[in-house]
Amino acid sequence: MLELVFDSKGTKLYNVCINNKKRRKQIMSVLREDFLWGGATAANQYEGAWDADGKGASISDMCTNGSYTTPKRVTPIFEENTLYPSREATDFYHHYKEDIALAAEMGFKCFRMSINWTRIYPTGMEETPNEAGLAFYDHVFDELGKYGIEPLVTISHYEMPYALVEKYNGWYSREVIDCFMRYCKTIFSRYQDKVKYWLTFNEINSGTMPMGAILSLGAVKGYCGPVNEVPDEKQIRYQALHHQFVASAKAIKYAHDNYPQFQMGCMCIFATKYPYTCNPDDVLLCQKEMRMMNWFTSDVHVRGYYPSYMNRFFEENHIVIQKEPGDDEILKEGIVDFYTFSYYMSSCESADSEVVEKSGGNLVGGVKNPYLKASDWGWQIDPKGLRYTLNELYDRYQIPLMVVENGLGAYDKLEEDGSIHDSYRIDYLRQHIAQMEEAVKDGVDLMGYTPWGWIDVVSASTGEMAKRYGMVYVDKYDDGTGDLSRKKKDSFYWYQKVIKSNGEDLD
């Protein structure tokens, strides 16, 4: 018996035998031929060499280590006998050739990374860039090019120059827009023939939460203390976010006008939420939280204007966004070409204050879903939520999507023979990739997939090394010790097979 197989546009591909158990491997791959398989990193968690070759201090360099139970701290001055894990991180700066060779061995088509702003402009305020910093990224992009790997570059990924925090209170000051544009123009010009895909800000919607005032906005001048105890100053955060919106739009318009070969995207945390029950109060609360957390910053980047639902939020929270003439026009002219997001977990929302069992999360949590398992850090594992999210995003925006962060933070055991058996990570990735492919069958236009921390990096939320995501193990520990050697985990070989088969072989 034969079955007709069609693509998403209804075009007949060919016939297959429905009784064949290997049917999946006989039909055309669900994913496009040029699908961007790869992995994701960020300079502030991976690069290290925090003061090498003229680099300045970023806000990440001023954050101490922490753990699941003890939050990391931000300190305005360096404290003796305190570990600042981002300063060495896992030392991509001195291992980039080795690491890119490992990525190539896995079959990467795409390498998501960020440029460290303070490596190019140490304080963010210089008129002339740091040539040593520019040369470093030349070497990185050339090495990627040698293997035919496409860089996907985040311009600002939680590494605002600390000097801008001290002078301007970070993005709260409009002055920082000009500093950012100088930085963008420099790297666009320098790498115009080496980089095609750009993201302006990492997880820009983190600025809607108090902790985002440190990580993303740098709007914490003079603050010293745990990152989870930052004052909830909404007026400051949303004004700072407006300045980031304007900066992002200006950078995108400048790129479109001067480098038409560039593809410009945005990047958001997507914290998928479900109503805890079918009680209308839960449904309305879930809708509100989805808007505040996920849709607001996404709508501005893709549609080019503030959504109407924010008016009530601003009014009820006494927030007045100071705009300059022309800001609204800038937002309209600087919309993105594609949309990227991180997806790790989902959570529930309940209007019932007696529902108290909470879930952990990547900066944002919620009520625990009784139908889901959780990671060692309390992040609920929801592969089908990724399919749901992709469908919701594509239905809303109708532009290409890319999953640029996804993965399982876990405790890995290094065996005596040097092996790392991480079947739990393989299982997590397998389930999410399978649901990603289901979304493509649903009609979603998906560009690529870069799981987070393909090589072990410092955790952004906790500042620890014990929370490992990588398919490559790095010998580095929470106390700062380790020889930084690299070892392949079982997941390395599994992902290599997945890429080679373009997602057909997930066994």
Residue spans for each PLM region:
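Short, Lys/Arg-enriched N-terminal segments with co-localized hydrophobic residues
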Residues: 7-27
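Non-catalytic scaffold segments within catalytic domains of secreted glycoside hydrolases
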Residues: 27-100, 104-109, 118-507
